[in-house]
């Protein structure tokens, strides 16, 4: 016989968990639908954006995902992780602006859900919602997330590292 918790506390915990999942799914869906369809409409314009996409393209051509190349010559200025993610995107969606920028759109979704969950944990559900909305509507992060540069992924990893540090500390 399986015993399940009953009463107001169990109902609150269940409702609270499902509202967090529902909120996270809603944030992810709105972020995706408001962002992803227009990623490939503009050509790559920034020097870094062009180089990252070219490095990813050359990873696909050479099969070398460890050593970044631009013009088939070694390019050690940037780490290979982001270009490897772009190459994976290009393998699925083809070589182009959309595939080069899609990883940052996915990073945007993860960042917004992470900000919501952290705000919810630190303060409450409403604070998490407002925090994600404020960040999601901010100009500079949106410009970065619409590009094919390494900064959004780098920022997400730093943010996750700081959160993990404080989680393990307490």
Where are these regions (language model features)?
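Membrane-integral, polyisoprenol-dependent glycosyltransferases
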Residues: 2-170
């Amino acid at each position: 016989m399986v015993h399940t918790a009953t009463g107001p506390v169990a109902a609150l915990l269940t409702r609270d968990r499902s509202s967090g999942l529902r909120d996270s799914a809603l944030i992810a869906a709105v972020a995706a639908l408001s962002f992803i369809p227009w990623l490939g409409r503009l050509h790559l314009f920034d020097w870094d954006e062009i180089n990252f996409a070219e490095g990813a393209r050359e990873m696909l051509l050479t099969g070398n995902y460890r050593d970044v190349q631009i013009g088939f010559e070694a390019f050690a200025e940037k780490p290979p992780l982001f270009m490897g993610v772009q190459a994976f995107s290009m393998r699925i969606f083809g070589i182009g602006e959309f595939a080069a920028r899609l990883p940052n759109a996915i990073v945007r979704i993860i960042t917004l859900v992470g900000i919501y969950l952290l705000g919810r944990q630190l303060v409450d559900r409403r604070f998490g919602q407002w925090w994600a909305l404020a960040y999601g509507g901010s100009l500079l992060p949106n410009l970065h997330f619409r590009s094919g540069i390494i900064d959004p992924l780098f920022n997400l990893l730093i943010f996750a590292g700081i959160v993990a540090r404080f989680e393990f500390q307490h």
